[in-house]
Each structure stands twice: as C-alpha cells, then as structure tokens.
Amino acid sequence: MNPEEQVVTWLISLGVLNSPKKIVDDPEEFLKTSLKDGTVLCKLIHRLLPGSAEKYCLEPKNEADCISNIQEFLRGCAVLKVELFEPHDLYSGEQFSKVLSTLTAVNKATEDQPSEGPCSHPSALSSAAGGAHTDSNSTASQSAKEMTENGSHQLVVKARFNFKQTNEDELSVNKGDIIYVTRVEEGGWWEGTLNGKTGWFPSNYVREIKSTDKPLSPKALKGLESTQLTKNYYPVVLQNILETERDYAKELQSLLGTYLRPLQSYDKLSAVDIASLLGNVEEISAFQQTLNQALEDVAKLPENQQRVGGCFMNLMAQFRSLYLTYCANHPSAVSVLTQHSDELEKFMESQGAANPGILILTTSLSKPFLRLDKYVTLLQELERHMEEAHADHEDVLKAITSFKSLVSQCQELRKRKQLELQILSESIQRWEGEDIKTMGNIIYMSQVMVQSGGSEEKEERYFLLFSNVLLMLSASPRMSGFIYQGRLPLTGMTLTKLEDAEGNEHMFEIAGNMMERITVSCSTSQDLHEWLEHLQRLTKGTCNTVSKTQSWSAHSTFGSTGQIRGPLEPPKILKPWSLSCLRPAPPLRPSAALSYKERMSYILKDSSKSPKTMKKFLPKRKTERKASDEEFVIRKSTAALEEDAQILKVIEAYCTGAGFQQALSSGSRKDSIPQVLLPEEEKIIIEETRSNGQTVTEEKSLVDTVYALKDEVKELKQENKRMKQCLEEELKSRKDLEKLVRRLLKQTDECSREETGRKSSLIA
C-alpha cells in the first residue's frame, strides 16, 4: 500500500473523510481534491486534539477561506513537533509530497494512542505538549488517581452540548444528560457511563455537577455495596427532575406569551380554528406552575421526608383530566396547522420565530406528549436510586404505573380522535340520508366485531355514537376509506352484557323492536365499559348481565315467566305441573325449533340478509321421491294457469282468515294462542329451467321459495357491487396511466428540444 492509500485509509477510519462511493483510480488526486479546502484537515486535528481547531470554515467559498483552514490545521499540529508544509503547497497541489510527509508524521506521532479511545489521551501527546500543559495534565492525573483509589466516588458531569458518536467506542450524549465519568485522561477525551453504556466523549462538552461526594450510579458499580451510593446519588436525580420541570414550565409560558395569546387577535383565522390551536394550554401551564412549586417545596424537606411520588399521586387526577383533554383536541389543532400553514407561518415569523415559523408552533404543541413520556423515565431513575425502605418508594412505583397508563390512554385517544376527524372530513361510500356532519358531535367511537342475529360470522365494524343514533361503518377493501353499513336508533334499544365462561371476551348485546339482534365484541374491558356507560345514559335504560350460553338459549327457545315479549309475539301459557310433564315431549314441527319472533322477522321483515341460521335449526328434509315423467310436462296451457291461480287464492284466503281470526281471538281472549300461518308447510308449484334447458315443475314450500329469491337478490347485489368496484378501479387506473403517458411525453419532448438545441449550437 503506497503512502497516498495509507493516508486515505487512515482518514476514513477516523471518520473525518467520507468513504468514496466508487473505486478510486488515483488516490493522490482524490486526496488533493478532498484536502484542498482544509475542512478535512481541521476535522482531523480537532479529532486528534479536541479544542485545537475550534474556529474554521465548514463551507469555504473562496481561496482565503481555504488558506485559513489549512493554517488552522498547521497551528494545531505545532504541538506535535512534526515537519510542516506551506498552505499554498496543498492549495496549489504542486508540492503535495510535503503534505503527505506531514500527514504521515502526524499519524506516527499519534499511533501510540490506546485502542479504547480513538484520538484520545496519547502518551506521546502529553510529552509533546510541553510545559504549557503540565499543570492541567497533572490535575487530570491527580483526579484519575483519586477516582482509582476511592472507587465509591467519581466525577458526575452534565452535558452542555449534543455529541454524536462517530466510532463504536464513543458515547453519544444529548444536552442535559447526566454522565458518570469512569476515566479521566490527558488529551481532552474522558470515558463515562450513560444509560448502562460506556464510551468516550469530549471533556469540553460537559460541566461538572457541583455537589459534595458525587457517587457512582449503583448500576456502574457491580459487586460493590450500593446502599450508601444510592442514598448519595438520590439528590442528583431529584435535582434533575426539578430542573427539567422548571424548563418545561418556562417553555409553556413562553409559548403562551409569545405566540398563542397574540394569536387570539389574528384576523386571518376563525375563532373556532384559534380555539383549536389554543386548546387547554393555559390550564396546563397554570397546573405545571403549581406542580413545579410543589416539587420545590418537597425538595426543601429532609431526604427521609421527601414525598416526590406522593406529590405526583396527589395531582394525578388533574394530570389525567388536563392531558386527556389536550390529546382529544390535538388532532383538530394539527388539522388547522395543515389547512392554514401559510397564514400561521407568516404570523409566527412576525412574532420573531425563525424560518420556517410553522415548525416552531408544531413542535411546541407536541411538547406535552413528550413531557408525559419523560415523567416515566424520570421517576424510574428516581426509584432506582431510592432505598426500598424510603417512605416514598411505594408512591413512586404507583406514579410510574399511573403515568404509563396515562401515556397509553393518551395515545389511544389521539388515534381515535384522528380517525373521527378523518371520517367526518372524508366522503363515505354508499352513504344514505342526511350528511354525517348534521348528526352533531361524536360521543364515542371504537372498532368492534359484530355478529348479526344468530350468525356465527364476525364482521369488523366501526361504531360511531351520536346523541340519537348509533352509526355503523366498515373499512374499504384497500383501507382507503369507509363504507356505510347502517344505523341503529337509540329509541327502544335494550342492552345486555354477556359474560363469557372463559372470561376472555368483552361482549354486549343490542336488541330492540325496530332492529335485528346484534352481538358486539369489544377489544378491551375499558372499551366495553365506555360503550355500556354511554349507551345506558343515552337510552335511559339498564343493562342486564347474563352468561353467553344463556343469551343464545334465550333467543332460540321460548321464554320463561316474566320475559318481555314483542307486540306480535303470543303470550306464554304456563301449564300446572303433573305426572304428564315427565312424559317425553312430542317431536316439534320443523318451524317450531325457532322462536315465534325470529320466524316472523325472517318471513315478514324486509331484510337484506337471508337467515342462514334458520336452516341450521331445521332438520333435513327426507329425500323427495323422483317425479314421474308425467309430472314434468310443460304446463303452459290455460287450464294449468287457472289451476295455479286457484292455489294462490286458497293460500291468500288462508292467510287472511288466519290473520282475521288472530285479531278476533286476541281481542276476546288475551291468554289464548292466535292462529299463526306457518309458511314452511304451505306448498306451491313452480316452473324452473334446468341447466340443460329443460323446463320442469317442482313443488316447493313458500319459505324455501322466499329464501331462494332472497339469496338470488343478494347474489345479484354482490355481483353489481363487484362490477361497480372493478369499474371504479379501472377508471382510476386509466387516469393514472393517462397522467404517466402525459408526463413521459412531456419529458421526451423536453429531451428532444435539448438535443436539437445542442446540435444547433454545435453547427453554429
């Protein structure tokens, strides 16, 4: 490997030179180009000797800037006592061999550095620095010696600036982080521990925390007795909580005083939009001032009487109320920021915000969420450095759990409110009736699983509760929108909470005179509680609790004494008990396996769904005998038609007579069972064309015919829906293709024009 390649490899390994994206054919030319402006050299000397090249131009624009950077590098190399080159030797590239010699000498002068810390504490470096650094080096050595002799005490520092690691053995720190220094060496690089990770960081990026007996974190001293360390480090963590709380309160005050309060008189936005941006920041700011003062008062007490966790728990109810309200409003504020970004950016910049001004407002409105997350981390750190016998230990654990729960609730609430806003602002497919915005505010919304009637199939639905109606939506197949699935009036609605035997389902049931029975499965117990609470309040009813098995049996058999019945349902007759009750019951007619209410709702109600569950309750019919050839004669004669008409008249008269008799008997004898038409037992003769083209006649029951027709209608609707969806997708694809073709044609036209222009210029 020649000297040029060695220097390139060295610079890349130190992280001061970016690795080339393709193979370099001429390393010397690559070095000349990379080092010409002096930026890489200044980074190099700052990497090797932190603080030696603090002022240099990152983006030199002229020769003077480049020469200045090179001179800054040469001044930093003076302490290494190596042969230097002239600045113009590098800038002009004429005497580049001298540049290589200097870089090689710098590499050799620093190659004795220990491998733990790159660019740090070389032994040769300390001797080369001369007498100017003798005092500082001896002080650092003395500090290192003291920490070695007394392992229970060490330097505790706080980061003044952000530092991002460039090598694996370095430590990334953020401003405000507390670092436990484990090793102090000459050269400006210290070793420390942060969040369980140990690495090197520049010493001029941190400041020492002024405190007596600064102990190591208990986790940094494995195998040592940590009780005393924990006790001594506790004040440092508490002080960090107070400082961050004080900073947060000041940020809220600044946000209100500088931007939000003046925004109230801004005439470019409506009062509703301004209210969405303000939210309850005023209340949160006042509350944080109260919390800050309470924590300050706690910190003044003796350590064994400090109840930081108790202070948080006393105010937890206010925390929950204020921050949940803020989270519920935040999606509306984001919507206003998006819709009026130009106006708000002008306003923010007029108030002194840096460009882009909208970014300041966006990040400021997100700080309450970040602060909630920070409380969990701060209290966990406090608990780690607190004795278990401390009077506040239990309250700190409770506060950690409470804040975790609050953070989770806030995240769920924000997602739900964002979804509500999306539903209200976008068009809903197959919507029926007046616009959704006229229904008022959404009281509650969540995603549930629904079972209709006695069906075993669960369907995913989005329930939206308004003041007088429960709206049902489903997600589109591509999750690009929502589809209208119906609405349930709250009038006459009854609720039943279902308790599953295994206890792993959160279910309730909705029923009523004007609706089909629906079983709803919630995702969590909290979601179930919210639905039952809101629905009971709006329906002004009560909620019964039954087991899941009892619920199904109650809907599939006749009711017991005192059971509420519908207006068309016959009363239940209680027979006195006798020995005859022990006899086997006679076989039920097929239709009697279903309750009266379900049979009538299936037959008489205009439903869009075929009651497949009824077929499950009915026993299979016996195999019908094969009809003779005489029965398959085509019936197209006038006599045959007249015969069919007579049969239909008989059925119609039977239905009318049964209904009339039921009306009379219900008026005179309320306890008697009215005559009920069982359409399943009534037969009709129909003509049907088989797949082979032959027309045959069959005898079918009325209920089977109705079901068959409903199934056919349902299939036709589904087919129509699929065709409509395919047509929409086809139209969308055609539009996308048209846009693509137009864009390609435009690009082709521009390329041809440029080519023509180049040819004409060459000819000229």
From Swiss-Prot:
Spell out the subcellular localization from the entry. Cell projection, Lamellipodium
Species of origin: Gallus gallus
- An example Gene Ontology molecular-function term: guanyl-nucleotide exchange factor activity
Report domain Calponin-homology (CH) positions: 1-110
| A single cellular component GO annotation | lamellipodium
Q: Where do the segments described as Disordered lie?
A: 109-149
Domain (PH) ranges? 435-540
The protein's UniProt keywords, in alphabetical order, are: Cell projection, Guanine-nucleotide releasing factor, SH3 domain
An annotated GO BP: lamellipodium assembly
Residues in DH domain copies: 233-413
Q: Which superkingdom does the taxonomy of this entry point to?
A: Eukaryota
Question: What name does UniProt use for this protein?
Answer: Rho guanine nucleotide exchange factor 6
Q: Domain named SH3: which ranges?
A: 152-211
Matching InterPro entries: AlphaPIX_SH3, CH_dom, CH_dom_sf, DBL_dom_sf, DH_dom, GDS_CDC24_CS, GEF6/7_CC, PH-like_dom_sf
